[in-house]
Amino acid sequence: MRGITGSSLQSRTVYTKKPKKKICKNCDSEFWAKAKYTEGYQDYCGFCRMVYRQDKRRIIKKSKVKGPTLYNPKVFSKRKPK
């Protein structure tokens, strides 16, 4: 058993072309993580058969609604020659 738990390393999944070693949450053993599936990557521990799925789809956060922006229409109509 390793001293480091896999829960802290689970959130730090980096999508690169090289396979990375990862520590399993369930049995704390190292395994190679980089098996591709349709929507992202699937990480599979060979010792305890636990499957981790990391979705590649971007999480959309709601942005704060800003107040109304006041535009001066005269500024846009007049173009200054350079």
UniProtKB/Swiss-Prot annotation:
It comes from Lactococcus lactis subsp. lactis. This is Uncharacterized 9.7 kDa protein in lcnC 5'region. Keywords: Plasmid.
